[in-house]
């Protein structure tokens, strides 16, 4: 009897795990359908390198932070 109960519980756990993984793959696939430029517009001015949600600097610019001055985008090599 314990074996049957164990088998049923194992099947239920396995099927729920498969469903969760399938939903996660579907969600990540939806994000990949749109290019990064459409998800987050770039900025030409102030930037925030410490936030993963902040948009990146445009083109060949980098985000530069100097002490207490707010961070800003500047062209590489200038």
UniProtKB/Swiss-Prot annotation:
Keywords: Amidation, Disulfide bond, Ion channel impairing toxin, Knottin, Neurotoxin, Secreted, Signal, Toxin, Voltage-gated sodium channel impairing toxin
Coiled coil residues, start to end: none
Tissue: Expressed by the venom gland.
Residues in the signal sequence: 1-22
Propeptide residue interval(s): 23-40
Residues with PTM Arginine amide: 76
Localisation per UniProt entry: Secreted
Disulfide bonds: 42-58, 47-63, 57-73, 65-71
GO MF entry, a single one: toxin activity
Assigned GO CC terms: extracellular region
Domain notes: The presence of a 'disulfide through disulfide knot' structurally defines this protein as a knottin.
Family, similarity comment: Belongs to the rTX family.
Function (record text): Agonist of rat Nav1.3/SCN3A. This toxin increases the peak current amplitude, and potently inhibits the fast inactivation of the channel (EC(50)=120 nM). The inhibition of fast inactivation is voltage-independent (depolarizing voltages ranging from 220 mV to 130 mV). The toxin might bind to the domain IV of the Nav1.3 channel, while domain II might not participate in interacting with the toxin but could determine the efficacy of RTX-VII. In vivo, when intracerebroventricularly injected into mice, the toxin causes involuntary body twitching (seizure-like symptoms).
Name of protein: RTX-VII
Lineage of origin: Eukaryota, Metazoa, Ecdysozoa, Arthropoda, Chelicerata
């Amino acid at each position: 009897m314990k074996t049957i109960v164990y088998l049923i519980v194992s099947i239920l756990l396995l099927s729920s795990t498969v469903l969760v993984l399938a939903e996660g793959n579907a969600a990540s696939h939806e994000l990949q359908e749109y290019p990064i430029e459409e998800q987050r517009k770039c900025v030409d001015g102030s930037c925030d390198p410490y936030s993963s949600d902040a948009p990146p600097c445009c083109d060949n610019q980098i985000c530069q932070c100097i002490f207490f001055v707010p961070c800003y985008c500047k062209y590489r090599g200038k």
